[in-house]
């Protein structure tokens, strides 16, 4: 998907259809002002309840000298550790009680040329306090020496996580792109020495020098009145005095490098080959610039589409294939690549280059272009629903990006007209000319090494690939796409009952036992959102099929449906802008589909074929086997993989569904086994539910349900046992000394194998317990003990499993392993015995705020509905989510905490130590 919003068509008048330097039109709903001290503010009122705030100081690591590396980032951290009106971490606690979550709603980031503070408010009740804190950030941060020393551990934890020793290919590619530039010399996080040597005085000096009103901007969107909030801004910020006036120049003119390279990959990655093409600088202020951005996006998508079809037609295994148009700092790039097993290197290099050369010399077909442009047309058609779903944080983030990149924040009407014009102008001739313009130049190729590869061995390979690219391309034998390929039901089924249900549902009981929950909703726009799912998943199949289960989804997708091959299916789905996402879980299975409402017949026909007409190609099965073997082998050779395998095999007996499948186990998998899995999952009814949300009427939906859903033949299914089988003697402690990092991965697993079955309210209780647990972990391990930047806690059990299985995860300095053990022991013990009403109230508020997205987001809502329906959790709990959350009592949470962390639980500690 393009990371921008596209708007539906307006009829153009008889004006010229040629993009030019006409300026883009600003969104007039923005009010921009400037205080006498130089601080700018940007206000965007909406009808939403929420309010989003962004406070940006256009200062970052570029302002640091050699002795100040990482100071801008360190100052950002200190804003959450005490200021004029907020002591310690009080600001985090305050906004959490209002429904915000640290990280998602309360956060900040530091870049090369800006530092931005973010607050998301549930309503206007805490707006004054939010602005008070942001005013504190401007010149009221307190640099308590003890807090500075504590925060060093947190920042070093962030440094360990974000600057790994075992660097991924993408990490190395980024640093290669800034090699020798000013970016390389100013890493925002700094270095370990600078972080450790920072003092309260040195940080305060940097802060007082650079945090100045003339460098700062405040963005407020959502539930505010322009005049009222402008007056409050003036009241809060007008007295912020300028104390320094150093020159700050926004640098958007520093190009990144696109050069032939050979780069290392991480231990879990496979070899790869890539290209990267410079497309100039960011900055979108004219129609022509916007059209060029779209042209680049189309070119990238055409490249990816062709690469995928070539690889799939050849039944070549691959780890990934991509082509994207994106921004790297202030440079626009088009990049693409493919990853593969070491044994395929020669063939994949050849296919990659030949495909690009063919595109350069012969372009694409009309069918290929139509497949890509369908996404633009769909976004255009869905203007109103997409625009209505935009929340205050969308407007705030978009404005922040536009200010940073010097873009015009475009009006809806202008965007709509310009996109309409682009679609009209982007003919096959134009698209191929643009594609040729991208590829008809010296293309820098980049090679990603595999494990054991030596840099010197492959040093000249990128140049050899470039030489091969200069040869004439080969014209494809056929570029035709198949317009029909889905098989039709021989006989329609029946609707045997229709019931109305709270929430605006029509509930259809079909003759084959499927239950369809249809919710008409204008917010869905011109899209139809569908989930078709059932209990079962891996728990439903014979243990002998577990290896085949790992391959089933990708094999089916690559093979195709009905009379479509995999490549033909991909083209057909793109052309019809239909998303089809099969899901095979541990205890459930199904498919998610999103398509145009006027093409609901096509979408449901696709569902019918997925349920009845998969067509496994033996070549694709072999390709997927090789893909799995390469991926799983690389993973299990890594330190993390070895730790996970050790923990898994020490917990679960052989031939149980949670036992990890290794690479050598998939070799014997047959087509018959894939077919058997499909028949078990989609040929038997374990309570299939279909949830459909669309702006349609029951009269439009019912005939299609009879034709395509009620016609799916289903057999009765035997009852399933979802019990989780564990080994008798679980080890309390496991360690692997194969880590690639200088840090220790610290995992604590808390397991209770005997827990009662759950209902809908239990899911709310569990979610709230996780929020409480995470808040405790962040307070104890991050803020108090300074052991890790981002410790985590999360449940791992699946729906229907009557167990409790939680993990505490952190990445720490090896010397702190014993201290972390003590801290985790304390956290777990206190969770089991002492939870407060305040914590329950805060978690309930946060959960209610997060679930509010169901009101405006049909896809988000559909996922929740489906989960609750197939698991019999009771959909009423969701329909009244705020009431359900508020009804959770302290005693209920304490009881769940005791079951989860208290007496009777088993504990396992797993450590990955450096080699």
Language model features with spans:
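Gram-negative bacterial Sec-dependent N-terminal signal peptides
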Residues: 1-17
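Proteolytic maturation boundary segments
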Residues: 15-40, 225-266, 271-280, 284-285, ...
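M16 family metallopeptidases and their MPP-like homologs
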Residues: 44, 49-61, 71-72, 89-137, ...
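Active-site recognition of the HExxH zinc-binding catalytic motif
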Residues: 69-77, 81, 301, 546-554, ...
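Long, His/Glu/Asp-enriched segments that create or flank divalent metal/ion-associated functional microenvironments
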Residues: 296, 779
